[in-house]
Amino acid sequence: MQRNGVMECSVCHSKVVAPSPRSVSRAYDKHRSKISSKYRALNFLLVSGDCILVGLQPILVFMSKVDGKFQFSPISVNFLTEVTKVIFAIVMLIIQSRKQKVGEKPLLSLSTFVQAARNNALLAVPALLYAINNYLKFIMQLYFSPATVKMLSNLKVLVIAILLKFIMRRKFSIIQWEALALLLIGISVNQLSSIPDGTKSFGLAVTTIAYIYTLIFVTVPSLASVYNEYALKSQFDTSIYLQNLFLYGYGAIFNFLGILGTVIFQGPESFDILRGHSRATMFLICNNAAQGILSSFFFKYADTILKKYSSTVATIFTGLASAAFLGHTLTVNFLLGISIVFISMHQFFSPLAKVKDDKPAGALEPEDAQNHRSSDSSFVNMTAGAADDASHLTATDERKPLLPI
């Protein structure tokens, strides 16, 4: 039972501080610092895989067009992508369950599934937001040029940082805020060269609906990423494949509802989800599914900011590959842009830019020191079986780790 930020055991009536969003962030950071070498290796693999998948996506989208148009329904692509990810999550759950040790709670039991579903109900929020965003990507092409869409997507960097600050209680130093601003500038400088001459306001269509789509296009995916990270990390001990099963299952449901909506407005023929698809679109679906799966590892074991930097680096490598293999010319804007991006990345992840706690985890004000010592004593006694003294542990301490170290 939870009351006034404190959880009380219904059996022994001991009290423990309830985790807050900041507790989730702190606990994760402390857990991560213990496995820094594995963390760096995982980050390298995540960024490398993301660069490959993001780099392939523009090529597959181009190959999916027929006479410059899409012959398939965008919602059908999103639905098939979610179904692919659900199948992958189920397969990985089966493999993981077979490797469980004796005495561990079975992953595939009904009780485990129901309990995990309750604990991860928040994943329905990013699933809905992703469904909206994936459809919006195609809609944006109707109102803006591709270069303008890229320019607008740059605003997500700052929006994500602001949302992380308020939702995840993440703290950024002044140097890190400057690094994020540099990232925004670097990407913009790179893409300015692709905007046609004579286009005003970066090609913005001055209509009310265009501005509404712009606001949604920037806000929705940022909210989805941050809420996804919060939902995954708040249940850190739950298998990521089980969490993905819920996330992708919700996504498939929302996209299927979108298909039913198109049937109502466009007729029964739009229910054929395979209409207009080709071999290229099947590769596109697999690529999108792989990106979604990889993103879940970013959000649970890394963070949203690293994912954004990774996607930026992937775009840069795509430009370099185009110059090397397709003969495209590298502009001055591109070279200046990537230089600014790499400076931003080095600055953001530099140890000097890390936010330091105002006070160490064990530091307290002098007047609170005596109370803290009695609280620690109560906690020790509780572990020894003295449940009567455990009720002294009622002070709110957001620095208390949520995750097991």
From Swiss-Prot:
GO biological process terms held by the UniProt record: transmembrane transport
Stretches assigned to the Lumenal side: 65-74, 143, 193-203, 266-281, 344-405
GO cellular component: Golgi membrane
Sequence intervals crossing the membrane: 44-64, 75-95, 122-142, 144-164, 172-192, 204-224, 245-265, 282-302, 323-343
Membrane topology, Cytoplasmic segments: 1-43, 96-121, 165-171, 225-244, 303-322
Membrane topology category: Multi-pass membrane protein
SUPFAM superfamilies referenced in this protein's UniProt entry, alphabetically: Multidrug resistance efflux transporter EmrE (SSF103481)
PANTHER family on file: NUCLEOTIDE-SUGAR TRANSMEMBRANE TRANSPORTER
Name of this protein: CMP-sialic acid transporter 4
Lineage: Eukaryota, Viridiplantae, Streptophyta, Embryophyta, Tracheophyta
